From Swiss-Prot:
Cofactor: pyridoxal 5'-phosphate
GO cellular component, one term: cytoplasm
Residues annotated as binding pyridoxal 5'-phosphate: G76, R77, W102, T153, D174, Q197, N239, T240
Organism of this sequence: Citrobacter koseri (strain ATCC BAA-895 / CDC 4225-83 / SGSC4696)
EC identifiers of the protein: 2.6.1.52
UniProt-listed SUPFAM superfamilies: PLP-dependent transferases (SSF53383)
Pfam annotation, one family: Aminotran_5
Enzyme category, top tier: transferase
Protein localization: Cytoplasm
Alphabetical list of PROSITE patterns matching this protein: AA_TRANSFER_CLASS_5 (PS00595)
Cofactor info, note text: Binds 1 pyridoxal phosphate per subunit.
Protein name: Phosphoserine aminotransferase
Membrane-spanning residues: none
GO BP: L-serine biosynthetic process; pyridoxine biosynthetic process
Amino acid sequence: MAQVFNFSSGPAMLPAEVLKLAQQDLRDWHGLGTSVMEISHRGKEFIQVAEEAEQDFRDLLSIPSNYKVLFCHGGGRGQFAAIPLNILGDKTSADYVDAGYWAASAIKEAKKYCSPNVIDAKVTVDGLRAVKPMSEWQLSDNAAYVHYCPNETIDGIAIDETPNFGSDVVVAADFSSTILSAPLDVSRYGVIYAGAQKNIGPAGLTIVIVREDLLGKANIACPSILDYTVLNDNDSMFNTPPTFAWYLSGLVFKWLKAQGGVAAMNKINQQKAELLYGVIDNSDFYRNDVAKSNRSRMNVPFQLADSALDKVFLEESFAAGLHALKGHRVVGGMRASIYNAMPLEGVKALTDFMVDFERRHG
């Protein structure tokens, strides 16, 4: 079978080595005669999987000991509700930074539980979309926390700054699309959450990193499966967890360690992004409308100068083994999601195709 590179924004490409291991365990896990999908989450075998996965995740991000790691259901959208339900405490408002589609979605959900102070950080610089620096975010004095999304997958916009608002400001962030792609100072955040389906593993699992002093504040109406304290007290097994997604994510963590960890992935991700943006910037045939200071390294949207060629581009790229390049319906065009599992070889195949496509159709 010819090589295929999956540029989907999520569920996303998984490392080939991980899929091979999972294939072996799918029918007979560790010689037990049962599938890894069938073992009990209460059994010692899965408990070992869970403990190793958490420790490897902690190692990869150097997570301080005063932070809890939770393996949850519900995806990022579930956390849009969980954040205010767990962190508001006796306050009624929180700061929400709007820099794109997913930040706006979090704001919409938060309005059910509090009065968000919306900080519109979207700006235009020389005709390109950008985000105000954090120094220009007008935080309010009575906010329980400030929430933002460091990477907007649809818009291709990234906020790479590290928060430095002071120790009394609780920062909550949606790292679904950038977790484990670059070094991260966890200590600057109160809550970090990430849906697994982009840089961690398959869909169905959400990982939450929460500072332990923020536990015990959940609203009385908070569903138990979203209550950080309940989840922590039950080792993320208050109900049956998504065991297969947890197991597969654990394999990805071990794979990441074998690649050299987050620092090594950061270098590769930079190389991939520079290669792809380089082809776009050196051409009048392709364009990207995000300022270089806020370009995403994980999700690269681009448009063709002649949109009438979009259908042809997608058909020919798919035939060439370059899949899932259609842009989100909100912005159109193309989008290449190049998460950790996408090898440099895959991005090189895409850029070679783009150059050839321009030669033939430009």
